[in-house]
């Protein structure tokens, strides 16, 4: 591009703010494009983007990208490929949810194996350790139940896949509202990171979220994964920053127009 951008990032929370059309998403996309799908970056200078990381000699980084626009699918994915009913998957958020369900099943197998291993060691604190291992999943379920309480939806805890109960009826995630899907995508993405160091990129996550959900978003993410580094763009920082005002950066502050 024509502008030189230098953005010094905080280890935990980074909020890039600016009006529409100022280049927030472009900056975020440039960084993401500098990383391969597996998080590798053989050089710290890629496609006009120089990345400085800690530790300095790192050659790959764990990351997730969440985009908030729930557009209809232009090219519906074939049902055979996904082994599910095409009628269920109508939007981009539905596709994200579908793949997150697979990751969620893997995550549960993983923590189940760790709990079994822990109990087999038969140490005096084995039960306590097992509880600690399963705590993030329970916290995730509690958080979703709390967020969805106004509409009477609760997660069915006996199911391996995510299903909801609402006044005696069972719902799939694809039957949720756009805002509910968006929040589920964000928190599920963070849960399956399994509390490991990750970079979480989010492009205007507030778009379809209730105002009170926007205000809680950053704290909820950090509660599920204290080791995550959040890098997000927003055009309404006053809403989303709730206690994080010092982590807000205006695009104009980091852009050299010369």
Give the positions of each predicted feature:
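Phosphate-coordinating catalytic segments in nucleotide- and nucleic-acid-processing enzymes
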Residues: 1, 6-8, 29-175
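Switch/communication elements of ASCE P-loop NTPase nucleotide-binding domains
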Residues: 1-38, 157-258
């Amino acid at each position: 591009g024509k502008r030189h951008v230098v953005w010094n990032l905080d280890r935990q929370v980074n909020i890039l703010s600016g009006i529409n059309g100022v280049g927030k998403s472009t900056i975020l996309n440039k960084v993401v494009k500098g990383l391969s799908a597996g998080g590798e970056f053989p050089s710290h200078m890629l496609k006009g983007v120089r990345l400085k990381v800690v530790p300095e000699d790192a050659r790959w980084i764990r990351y997730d990208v969440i985009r908030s626009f729930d557009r209809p699918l232009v090219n519906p994915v074939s049902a055979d490929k996904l082994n599910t009913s095409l009628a269920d998957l109508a939007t981009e958020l539905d596709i994200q949810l579908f793949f997150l369900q697979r990751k969620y099943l893997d995550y549960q197998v993983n923590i189940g194996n760790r709990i079994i291993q822990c109990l087999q060691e038969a140490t005096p604190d084995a039960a306590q350790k097992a509880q600690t291992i399963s705590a993030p999943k329970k916290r995730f379920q509690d958080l979703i139940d709390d967020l969805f309480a106004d509409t009477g939806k609760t997660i069915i805890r006996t199911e391996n896949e995510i299903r909801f109960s609402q006044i005696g009826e069972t719902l799939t995630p694809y039957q949720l509202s756009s805002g509910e899907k968006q929040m589920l995508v964000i928190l599920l993405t963070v849960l399956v990171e399994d509390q490991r160091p990750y970079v979480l990129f989010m492009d205007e996550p507030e778009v379809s979220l209730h105002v009170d959900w926007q205000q809680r978003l950053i704290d909820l993410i950090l509660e599920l994964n204290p080791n995550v580094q959040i890098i997000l763009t927003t055009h309404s920082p006053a809403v989303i920053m709730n206690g994080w005002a010092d982590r807000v950066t205006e695009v104009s502050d980091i852009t050299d127009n010369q």
